[in-house]
Amino acid sequence: MMTLTNAQIGQLAAQFFFAGAGTLSFAILFACPRRALPCCALVGAVGWFIYELAILYGADAAAAALIAVIPLSLAARICAVLLKTPVTVFLLTGIFPLVPGAGIYYTAYYFIQGNNSLALANGISTFKVAVALAVGIALVLGLPLPQAPFWKRK
């Protein structure tokens, strides 16, 4: 098992903070309710933290995205229940740091430059990450919410 150095821990803490700030900014731009903004930032920061941790432990980008999006989706679902807000508010803003925007950009860039082999490699990698995100979200959102016992239901 690999141990993290102090520098890596500091870098992870900084990335956690900046991922939360970026997610918060996107949530404000997305016009999320004010009371949901802290949870939006926390969901995005947690997802990015787990992604970076998985990368540090040797996972590739697609596996790290899958590992990160499962707890991210769980956190989004918990926040949605606690704040009585649609889960999409937390999910859309929370996956913002994980979406492979740079991969899409470089795929198009290499394609325009005529470097088809790099475009294909980037496109496949980007597609894997996107599929991993979709599968992870579907796995978590496919789970039923816990129900109150029938004698406590109104």
Which positions does each model-derived feature cover?
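The feature identifies polytopic integral membrane transport proteins across all domains of life
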Residues: 86-96
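Hydrophobic alpha-helical membrane segments
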Residues: 94-106
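Alpha-helical transmembrane segments and their membrane-interface boundaries
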Residues: 1-74, 78-79, 85-87, 106-154
